[in-house]
Amino acid sequence: MVHVYKGLFLECDPPTKQFVEYISKQEHFEVIVLDETHLFLQGGDEKVINSIQRRIDDLQNQNTYSVFDKDQ
């Protein structure tokens, strides 16, 4: 029997995978874990993609050190 699902295939590193799983609980979309670096976002649409990208960008900006960000 064949099952077809509409969604988004996502390849990422394990820490990002965990973060996407965390986001999925807040944003209410279903994540199917395929392996340690691949996820399938069931029902993923443009809104979900933009939300994930925005949250990952915010996380990366928080974890990036810049000389120009030092308090003076």
Curated annotation (Swiss-Prot):
Q: Which InterPro entries match?
A: TFB5-like_sf, TFIIH_TTDA/Tfb5
What's in the keyword line of the UniProt record? Answer: DNA damage, DNA repair, Nucleus, Transcription, Transcription regulation
**One BP annotation, GO:** transcription initiation at RNA polymerase II promoter
Q: Which Pfam families match?
A: Tfb5
GO CC annotation terms, alphabetical: transcription factor TFIIH core complex; transcription factor TFIIH holo complex
Looking at the record's lineage, which domain of life comes first? Answer: Eukaryota
Where does the record place it? Nucleus
Quaternary structure and partners: Component of the 7-subunit TFIIH core complex composed of XPB/repB, XPD/repD, gtf2h1, gtf2h2, gtf2h3, gtf2h4 and gtf2h5, which is active in NER. The core complex associates with the 3-subunit CDK-activating kinase (CAK) module composed of cycH/cyclin H, cdk7 and mnat1 to form the 10-subunit holoenzyme (holo-TFIIH) active in transcription.
PANTHER family attached here?
Answer: GENERAL TRANSCRIPTION FACTOR IIH SUBUNIT 5
* Biological role stated in the UniProt entry: Component of the general transcription and DNA repair factor IIH (TFIIH) core complex, which is involved in general and transcription-coupled nucleotide excision repair (NER) of damaged DNA and, when complexed to CAK, in RNA transcription by RNA polymerase II. In NER, TFIIH acts by opening DNA around the lesion to allow the excision of the damaged oligonucleotide and its replacement by a new DNA fragment. In transcription, TFIIH has an essential role in transcription initiation.
The UniProt similarity line reads: Belongs to the TFB5 family.
Q: What name does UniProt use for this protein?
A: General transcription factor IIH subunit 5
Species source reads: Dictyostelium discoideum
Ranked from the top, the taxonomy reads:
Eukaryota, Amoebozoa, Evosea, Eumycetozoa, Dictyostelia
Gene symbol here is: gtf2h5
